[in-house]
Amino acid sequence: LLRQKRPIVNIGIIGTGSIASRFVPEPKNVNSASVSVAYNPNQEKCVSFCEKFLIPIVARDLEELYENCDAVYIASPHYTHYEYAKSALNAGKSVLCETPFVFSKKQAEELYSIAEKKELLLQIALKTAYCPAFGHLFSLLKSGVIGEIVEVNASVTTLTDENSAKLDSKYFGGIM
């Protein structure tokens, strides 16, 4: 299925940070997808990103990005997701958006309404729950091999500067 001949979907990337860096290699595993263009308001960072990943087009603005892609992957700062997703949908592009998707139910409903009216896809990039290791873990849990589950503790740790903008729920949704 992954190797069937299909028209290539050209993907445009909004945001060129570490999350986007992890995304770029993935379409190479599917013969019908290619990253064709990237955009970052910081053009210097965008040029560097495109050179590193051999992305042919550095978009100067969103209009140029939309002209050169079929779908958009959003990996920009969290507080920009809503505006970028709305802009892409209104430009007729399907959207894959990193988490957190948006900051309110109202924003989510509005974006899904636009996508539905325009018959576009709007997807949250929630990959972990669908990776093979997670599926295997759940099958082990359901099989009883591990025994009765009485408690689950999970954590993600990282050293974050207490003044980091990522802790500001207004702009990043907060990581706490």
Segments and roles (model prediction):
Residues G15, T99, G144:
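Conserved G/P- and acidic residue-centered "switch" motifs that form tight phosphate/ATP-binding loops
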Residues A33-V37, V72, G173-G174:
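Short active-site oxyanion
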Residues A33, D70, K93, L120-L121, ...:
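Short, well-ordered coil/turn segments that N-cap beta-strands
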Residues V37-Y39, A59, Y73, V150-N153:
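Residues embedded in well-ordered beta-strands within globular domains across many folds
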Residues L1-F53:
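N-terminal Rossmann-like dinucleotide-binding module
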Residues E109-K127, E148-V152:
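Rossmann-fold dehydrogenase core element
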Residues F53-Y112:
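Beta-loop-alpha module in the N-terminal Rossmann-like domain of NAD(P)-dependent dehydrogenases
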Residues T128-M176:
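Predominantly a Rossmann-like dinucleotide-binding segment in NAD(P)-dependent oxidoreductases
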